[in-house]
Amino acid sequence: KLIRYFLSITLPNTKVFRLSSLLVKLSKPFKFLMPSKIKDMIELMPTKFPKKSLPIKEVYKSSTKKRIARVALLTGCVQKEISPQINEATIRLLNRHGVEVVVPKKIRCCGSLNHHLGKEEDAHQDFKNNINTWYEEHQKGNLDAILSNTSGCGTTMKDYGFIFREDKELSKKAKVISELTKDISEYIFESLKLDIKDKGKKYKVAYHSACSMQHGQKVHSQPVSLLEKTNNEIMEIPEGHICCGSAGTYNILQSKIAKQLLKKKVNNIESLNPDFISTGNIGCITQIAHGTKVPILHTIEVLDLSLIHISEPTRRLV
């Protein structure tokens, strides 16, 4: 219960998350004195954060003469702190293709972390805040889509309509928000034409389909098709339907089983001898990065790099 409480107040709150990471860094020399679950949690917590290269704004205007769409983007809680480059790549790519990106200040967390931890009251506060904020934005300026670049978040957002189906005040709004929600790869595949030039050198890319993506949202072929357009060799991982062991907070709450799943996943990945790994979920990225030295990038980063000057992928700092 103590671990669940710690996770519920830490992960969705960026300031508390950063403070906790500092405390974790200071406590690492003494982790041998701690229970195994606490040790595992300490191992997974970051101790440094990448610098953000994009200014924080509520509206990122299209960089083309004509705007073709207006979307809202969930920048997330944990992801925007440990891997801000994912949101930056998302916004760059969308702006470059005529899409205006709206990031309302009132949106913090999608609510999925507390939802899966059984903290329903806290989760529903986030759900209601997000539904009302995005609906107001939609009414004000018509949103063509609400995008998530973290598949675990997107799965929950697509469920808002079902969760509030019997709520007289929110059922209509929640249904609209869920119908507008798309994974970033889903939206790009359906709505944008990427101008990807042949960069010459081709990489062997192992694509990991996150459980929340392939099972939760039934989105699989779209990111694979987009990656194939980068002229790299895209390889699907053997037993790709099996979890990497992240599963939200599962890798902390059930660390023994999670480690077994991670070992199996990494063995399957490394059997392909890829240059790097690609996936669409920050939880999977963090988990897999702790089990292999093979660099791992978000799908949107691969696409963004393919549209500009692609350099050698480097290992993610998580």
Task: Give the location of each predicted region.
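Iron-sulfur cluster-binding electron-transfer modules in prokaryotic oxidoreductases
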Residues: 1-311, 315
